[in-house]
Curated annotation (Swiss-Prot):
Source species of the chain: Ralstonia pickettii (strain 12J)
Entry binding sites for carbamoyl phosphate: R71, T72, R121, H151, Q154, G280, P281
Full protein name: Aspartate carbamoyltransferase catalytic subunit
Pathway the protein acts in: Pyrimidine metabolism; UMP biosynthesis via de novo pathway; (S)-dihydroorotate from bicarbonate: step 2/3
Binding site for L-aspartate: K99, R184, R239
């Protein structure tokens, strides 16, 4: 009889206690996060006098970012504070890890300070899993991006954005364009889209920037930008992750833009009501033209806004589930 492995993200009852990856989560769990996030959108409403709810009052949330981040770290901090948590942002460059202390020693010391939740971004794939294996049962871990592996909250906020504008996934064609090989966002988006029943997921990019096995994930692969964009409902652009590249995978940024940059002419090949997304940071003139990034079909800034509600939902859900 084959051995089965428990999902480390779930309690014995199948509830979400950590968010480490979208892979392995059910449609019901993803939908629950999106539905809960919808309820939190009103908390961030500009007309609301007090933008707080007491869900995490008395809880301590540690943001541990071992890689630089602006949007993700800031939106996690805002999300935790709107849930009334105490938030501690650890300055990793000045911390003991830069002096040789191991990752688990750091976690154990912070746990001794009564941490209730760790939000972790790390250059090593699997680091949040390692932390989740070693924390106390009442402590929760959220992956804010680990190496090339996963960025589950970005994937969820992308799904929230798509659902907000398109309502239903079952008739959608979504194109993910660019450096998919090095993109943890692309992996999370693909798993989320297929789990939520998206009709067709496309990957567009040069052969050097597309990983093997995409077809086995149910993804249609295109190397020609124009062909890949025909009739799509959603375009998700990705930046070139030069910091993760080894060797010359591309001739130049200018040549890349000529072949794969999203211009208004190329966007016209998609459906007239197609939306344009980007997880940021954008490289204008490399993967996207400013006229498109700032155009009427762009929902890029809305993604950032929705990210707060989605991260509030994730934190609120995991905090309520213990073995």
């Amino acid at each position: 009889m084959p051995k089965t492995f428990a999902n480390p993200q779930l309690t014995k009852n199948g509830e979400l206690k950590h968010l480490l990856s979208i892979e392995g989560l059910s449609r019901d769990i993803l939908t629950d996060v999106l539905d809960t996030a919808q309820q939190f959108v009103s908390v961030s409403d500009s007309d609301r006098e007090v933008k707080k709810v007491p869900l995490l009052r008395g809880k301590s949330v540690f943001n541990l970012f071992f890689e630089n981040s602006t949007r993700t770290r800031t939106t996690f901090e805002i999300a935790a504070k709107r849930l009334s948590a105490d938030v501690i942002n650890l300055n990793i460059n000045a911390s003991s890890t830069s002096k040789g202390e191991s990752l688990l020693d750091t976690i154990n010391n912070l746990s001794a300070m009564q941490a209730d939740m760790f939000v972790v971004r790390h250059a090593s794939s699997g680091a949040p899993y390692l932390i989740a294996e070693h924390v106390a049962p009442h402590v929760h871990v959220i992956n804010a991006g680990d190496g090339r592996h996963a960025h589950p909250t970005q994937g969820l906020l992308d799904m929230f954005t798509i659902r907000h504008y398109k309502k239903d996934f079952s008739n959608l064609t979504v194109a993910i364009v660019g450096d998919i090989l090095h993109s943890r966002v692309a992996r999370s988006d693909i798993h989320a889209l297929t789990t939520l029943g998206c009709a067709e997921v496309r990957a567009i990019g040069p052969r050097t920037l597309l990983p093997g096995g995409l077809e086995h994930m149910g993804v249609r692969v295109f190397h020609n930008m124009e062909e890949g964009l025909k009739g799509v409902d959603v375009v998700i652009m990705l930046r070139l992750q030069n910091e993760r590249m080894s060797g010359a995978l591309l001739p130049s940024a200018q040549e890349y833009f000529k072949a794969y940059g999203l211009t208004q002419d190329r966007l016209a090949l998609a459906k007239p009501d197609a939306i344009v997304m980007h997880p940021g940071p954008m490289n204008r003139g490399v993967e996207i033209d400013s006229a498109v990034a700032d155009g009427v079909q762009s929902v890029i800034l809305n993604q950032v806004t929705f990210g707060i509600a989605v991260r509030m939902a994730v934190m609120g859900i995991v905090a309520g589930n213990n073995d």
